[in-house]
Amino acid sequence: MANIKSAKKRAVQSEKARKHNASRRSMMRTFIKKVYAAIEAGDKAAAQNAFNEMQPIVDRQAAKGLIHKNKAARHKANLTAQISKLA
C-alpha cells in the first residue's frame, strides 16, 4: 500500500475508475450479445433492432476511450455483414 498521500489518492481513484470501466464494458458486451443472439435465432428484424440499440453505445465507449475506435468499427462491420446475410 502507498505511503504518500497523493499515491493513496491515485489508488482510490484508480479503483473507482476500474469499477466504472468494468460496468460500462459489461453493459456494452451485453448489448453485443443481444445482437448475436438475434442473429443465431435467424430473426433479421430483431437483429436489426438490437444492432440499432448497440451501435451508439459502442460508439460512445470508443469515444470515451474504453475501447479502441477500430474495435468498435470491427464489431459494427462484422455484425452488419452477418445481419445482411440473414434471409
Curated annotation (Swiss-Prot):
<keyword id="KW-0694">RNA-binding</keyword>
<feature type="region of interest" description="Disordered">
    <location>
        <begin position="1"/>
        <end position="26"/>
    </location>
</feature>
<protein>
    <recommendedName>
        <fullName>Small ribosomal subunit protein bS20</fullName>
    </recommendedName>
</protein>
<dbReference type="GO" id="GO:0015935">
    <property type="term" value="C:small ribosomal subunit"/>
</dbReference>
<dbReference type="InterPro" id="IPR036510">
    <property type="entry name" value="Ribosomal_bS20_sf"/>
</dbReference>
<comment type="function">
    <text>Binds directly to 16S ribosomal RNA.</text>
</comment>
<dbReference type="GO" id="GO:0003735">
    <property type="term" value="F:structural constituent of ribosome"/>
</dbReference>
<dbReference type="GO" id="GO:0070181">
    <property type="term" value="F:small ribosomal subunit rRNA binding"/>
</dbReference>
<keyword id="KW-0699">rRNA-binding</keyword>
<dbReference type="GO" id="GO:0005829">
    <property type="term" value="C:cytosol"/>
</dbReference>
<dbReference type="Pfam" id="PF01649">
    <property type="entry name" value="Ribosomal_S20p"/>
</dbReference>
<comment type="similarity">
    <text>Belongs to the bacterial ribosomal protein bS20 family.</text>
</comment>
<dbReference type="InterPro" id="IPR002583">
    <property type="entry name" value="Ribosomal_bS20"/>
</dbReference>
<keyword id="KW-0689">Ribosomal protein</keyword>
<dbReference type="GO" id="GO:0006412">
    <property type="term" value="P:translation"/>
</dbReference>
<keyword id="KW-0687">Ribonucleoprotein</keyword>
